[in-house]
């Protein structure tokens, strides 16, 4: 099983290019199921989760191939779907596999999708997906570990979810594009990835208003078509934030290319609070560490507030910062599993319920640590980059789920890091 070996203490310098957003790519790949024409997506990252999604789609009968000439492009042809079932063997490793449910049901009137897996960071139920589809007229039962759904044609409805749910909003948004009549999604998630999905669907002929707000209106149409040009997936704001934290922690000076500062307001505000110098352009961010950072208090919440997917990386930064800081997690329970591993590197962290109190220290010391989920693995890499001596990060398959060639990009800006067996 692959590991990362990191020799810490080297500041990061130079330029790095940000990949396409994982959390936009996954629903947009699934959106191909809505369209009986070949669809091309550009800026598709090379991630394990993308590979898993493509396996699910191919099982359903989608022809999906990366371009040999433009390897960031993926062509998907869902003209001839051969099955409406996404089996446990494919779905178990990734929660986002549930995103085939809405498109299959909307276009074909039936779907059988295994209950999903993914990161072990707490309960992330799919009941809001089911509730919303039932409001649109679907008949759904959960049996033998599968969601079995049927509908003659989905009907437009006003749907208010009990909580803000990103994948729930995406599933219902895709399903509503082919429904009969108007659907209104209340309490919708506002993430940039949802706006990007909506822009793709609009390019396919969907009628959507209000994306990026808590109320999205969708007027169903009879049929969607492929856009005239490939849809460009937005940059990954979480990869961007992760590299920003790594540079701030190591004392470096790096320019991030092909990214968007306007998707990162809360993260950039906290980095400035930590006394990190930032310059932003239309598609770039320059980050310079002005000495040892200051610890910052943060509280995770739904977009546009501070993202839960950046909590672990900022905790790693706080570990070597001046002062004591509080990190409050409000989105997922059990998302402090990286704490014990950071403590192995010498960090001073105490957890009380949903709050972690971090006492910053001058230096960490290298050790062997174990990744427990996707973003926790990124925090351990950041900690390893600043620790004295060697740090080995085990179980980095978590990292590969959501970061495109992370160690290669880090080496390109000066990190001493290598993948080993």
From Swiss-Prot:
It catalyses: phosphoenolpyruvate + UDP-N-acetyl-alpha-D-glucosamine = UDP-N-acetyl-3-O-(1-carboxyvinyl)-alpha-D-glucosamine + phosphate. Its EC number is 2.5.1.7. Keywords: Cell cycle, Cell division, Cell shape, Cell wall biogenesis/degradation, Cytoplasm, Peptidoglycan synthesis, Pyruvate, Transferase. It holds the Pfam family EPSP_synthase. One of its GO terms (biological process) is peptidoglycan biosynthetic process. Phosphoenolpyruvate binds at residues 22-23. It is found in: Cytoplasm. UDP-N-acetyl-alpha-D-glucosamine binds at residues 95, 124-128, 309, 331. The modification 2-(S-cysteinyl)pyruvic acid O-phosphothioketal is found at residue 119. Pathway: Cell wall biogenesis; peptidoglycan biosynthesis. GO terms for cellular component: cytoplasm. The active site is at 119 (proton donor). It comes from the Bacteria. InterPro entries: Enolpyruvate_Tfrase_dom, Enolpyruvate_Tfrase_sf, MurA_subfamily, RNA3'P_cycl/enolpyr_Trfase_a/b, UDP_GlcNAc_COvinyl_MurA. One of its GO terms (molecular function) is UDP-N-acetylglucosamine 1-carboxyvinyltransferase activity. Belongs to the EPSP synthase family. MurA subfamily. Cell wall formation. Adds enolpyruvyl to UDP-N-acetylglucosamine. This is UDP-N-acetylglucosamine 1-carboxyvinyltransferase.
């Amino acid at each position: 099983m692959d590991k990362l070996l990191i020799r810490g203490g080297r500041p990061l310098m130079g330029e790095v290019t940000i990949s396409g957003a994982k959390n936009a790519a996954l629903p947009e790949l699934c959106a191909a199921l809505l369209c009986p024409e070949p669809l091309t997506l550009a800026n598709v990252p090379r991630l394990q989760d993308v590979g898993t999604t493509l396996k699910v789609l191919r099982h359903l009968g989608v022809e999906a191939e990366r371009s040999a000439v433009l390897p960031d492009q993926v062509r998907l042809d869902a003209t001839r779907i051969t099955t409406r079932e996404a089996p446990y063997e494919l779905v178990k490793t990734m929660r986002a596999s549930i995103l085939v449910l809405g498109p299959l049901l909307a276009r074909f009137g039936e779907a059988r999708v295994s209950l999903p897996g993914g990161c072990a960071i707490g309960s992330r139920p799919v009941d809001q997906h089911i509730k919303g589809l039932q409001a649109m007229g679907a008949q759904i039962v959960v049996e033998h570990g599968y969601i079995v759904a049927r509908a003659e044609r989905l009907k437009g409805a006003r749907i208010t979810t009990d909580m803000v749910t990103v994948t729930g909003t995406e599933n219902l948004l895709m399903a509503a594009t082919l429904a009969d009549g108007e659907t209104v999604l209340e309490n919708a998630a506002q993430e940039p990835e949802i706006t990007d999905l909506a822009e793709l669907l609009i390019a396919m002929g969907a009628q959507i208003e209000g994306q990026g707000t808590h109320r999205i209106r969708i007027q169903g149409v009879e049929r969607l078509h492929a856009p005239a040009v490939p849809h460009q997936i937005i940059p990954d704001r979480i990869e961007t934030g992760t590299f920003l934290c790594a540079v701030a922690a190591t004392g470096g000076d790096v320019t991030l290319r092909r990214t968007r500062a306007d998707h990162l307001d809360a993260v950039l505000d906290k980095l400035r609070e930590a006394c990190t110098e930032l310059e932003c352009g239309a598609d770039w961010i320059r980050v310079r560490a002005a000495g040892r950072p200051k610890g910052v208090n943060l509280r995770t919440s739904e977009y546009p507030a501070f993202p839960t997917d950046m909590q672990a990386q900022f905790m790693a930064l706080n570990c070597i910062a001046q002062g004591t800081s509080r990190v409050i997690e409000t989105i997922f329970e059990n998302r402090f599993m990286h704490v014990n591993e950071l403590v192995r590197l010498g960090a001073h962290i105490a957890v009380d319920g949903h709050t972690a109190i971090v006492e910053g220290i001058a230096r960490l010391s290298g050790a062997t640590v174990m990744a427990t989920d996707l973003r926790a693995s990124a925090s351990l890499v950041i900690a390893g980059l600043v620790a004295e001596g060697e740090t080995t990060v085990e179980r980095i398959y978590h990292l590969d789920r959501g970061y495109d060639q992370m160690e290669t990009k880090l080496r390109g800006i000066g990190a001493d890091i290598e993948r080993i067996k």
